[in-house]
Amino acid sequence: MVSKKSNDQSVEYASKSLRVSINSYISFLNDPSLKNATEMAIASNLAGMAINISKTTAPHAVSYPFTSLFNVSHGHAVGLFFEKFFSFNYKNKDKSEPSFDLKKRFDLIFNLFDVQGINDFTSKISLIKKQAKLEDNLQTLNINIKQSSDDIIKGINLLRPVSYTH
């Protein structure tokens, strides 16, 4: 939704995806049913349609070495630094020059998550990740950034389309 390549259509797909997944994700993980599995499949399809237009962003490009080097599942790896990337982009939104009103996009995201701003948003994402039992502590995941930094940097997939706001 904040990718420079996003447009009204991708934002519509992403918004619909988030409306569904926000309400179904944790229940799907905790007590899978045909209903919430169907909802998550629909959300996934809508998200894929949005990404097909807007392309992936920095958290996705950075995820690959965490999967290949440390066996962190791809989706989990994408989420490892999501709040940090999102917060950075929010705090630097005035330095970005997208073809759309970036503040309105952030406000839409905050509205979808029923939060009041960036701090509430990052807290809510952290809570969702905790409820999903997605570990963020790199030490707990046996990831030593300093020791592995060269391999991590080499593993970042620059061929994947990356068009975050910065």
Segments (PLM) and residue ranges:
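Amphipathic alpha-helical segments in well-ordered regions
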Residues: 1, 24, 65, 84-85
